[in-house]
UniProtKB/Swiss-Prot annotation:
GO molecular function: ATP binding; glutathione synthase activity; metal ion binding
Family label: Belongs to the prokaryotic GSH synthase family.
Gene, per the UniProt record: gshB
Pfam families: GSH-S_ATP, GSH-S_N
UniProt protein name: Glutathione synthetase
An annotated GO cellular component: cytoplasm
InterPro entries to which the protein is assigned, alphabetical: ATP-grasp, ATP_grasp_subdomain_1, Glut_synth_pro, GSHS_ATP-bd, GSHS_N, PreATP-grasp_dom_sf
Residues holding Mg(2+): E275, N277
Entries under PROSITE patterns matching the protein: ATP_GRASP
Cofactor binding remark: Binds 1 Mg(2+) or Mn(2+) ion per subunit.
Pathway as given in its UniProt record: Sulfur metabolism; glutathione biosynthesis; glutathione from L-cysteine and L-glutamate: step 2/2
Length: 308
């Protein structure tokens, strides 16, 4: 069985930490034929989608074959694992992948859903599970919401890994100037959420496969910061799901599955849904290490069940 992984340049991947590397190594252990490429390697000739890809032996890391020009129809499964930002190049890649999808190739996650589920805005489908949230461009509306909530967090809609996330009080000096900056002079919407003090106890990353939670870690912010993202120095610790967190997964699971979002990471703070990560969820290595769960192998097992 042939699987294609669409990634950032392979040279940038740290196999000790990277979830895509973990998935490729699990696929290798399952005796699957693995290929890699970047979004720039995708193409369409008429109504047929193609790719310039290389074989990879990911364990031990790594051995690459020569580049070959192949039809995407040759692959049983294609993983779209390019990290954000979801820019024009990313969006065009999803359209090219839909050509293969229409020909019967399984694409994970579903291209149309990758476009539709912005990692900040997608959570609004489940707003009752979230902290009070406003998405707006107008400074006056954002200031009024901040006044109502007292202390808020600003999030750029296209950000990743906690980049650009700002904690601010409603009476902060220079708030107008800050809001003008983050909204590009009221031309770009931004997400504003009530600040949750429980973030100091951790931000839980829960990984769902086909709508079911298979593993989780708790991420603690580094000293002097409220952001717990591992990329910003947060520390991961072992954890179990609370009753509330299980309820959140049960609420989200059917929608994720029906939308073709096979592999998803959700973030929960103090029992409140924060984000739904669908593009290239991380955390596999940490779950495997801290929880002693062969998560990547379980993901591939669930995938192969689709072909049995």
């Amino acid at each position: 069985m042939k699987q294609l992984f669409i990634l950032d340049p392979i040279e940038l991947i740290n196999p000790a930490k990277d979830s895509s590397a973990a998935l490729m190594q699990a696929a290798h252990r399952a005796s699957l034929d693995i290929w890699v490429c970047t979004p720039a390697d995708l193409q369409a000739k008429g109504a047929k989608a193609r790719v310039v890809a290389k074989t990879i032996v990911p364990e031990p890391w790594k051995s690459l074959g020569e580049a070959q020009n192949l039809s995407l129809n040759e692959f049983h499964c294609i993983w779209m694992r390019k990290d954000p930002p979801v820019d024009e190049a990313f969006l065009y890649a999803t359209h090219l992948l839909e050509v293969a999808e229409r020909a019967g190739v399984l694409v994970l996650n579903k291209p149309a859903s990758l476009r539709a589920w912005n990692e900040k805005l997608g959570a609004l489908r489940f707003s009752k599970l979230m902290a009070p949230t406003l998405v707006a461009s107008r400074v006056n509306e954002l200031k009024e919401f901040a006044k109502e909530q007292g202390e808020v967090v600003l999030k750029p809609l296209g950000g990743k890994g906690g980049q650009g996330v700002i904690r601010v009080a409603d009476a902060a000096l220079g708030l107008d100037a800050l809001l003008e900056l983050v909204t590009s002079q009221e031309q770009m919407p931004v997400m504003m959420q009530k600040f949750l003090p429980k973030v100091i106890e951790g931000d839980k990353r829960i990984l769902l496969v086909n709508g079911e939670p298979l593993g989780a870690i708790n991420r603690l912010p580094k000293c002097g910061d409220f952001r717990s993202n591992l990329a910003l120095g947060g520390q991961a610790e072992a954890t179990n799901l609370s009753k509330r967190e299980k309820e959140i997964c049960e609420e989200l699971g059917p929608s994720l599955k029906s939308e073709g979002l096979f592999f998803v990471g959700i973030d929960v703070i103090g029992g409140m849904l924060s984000e739904i990560n669908v593009t290239s969820p991380t955390g596999v290595r940490e779950v495997e290490k801290l929880m002693n769960i062969p998560l990547a192998d379980q993901v591939i097992e669930r995938l192969l069940a689709n072909f049995s």
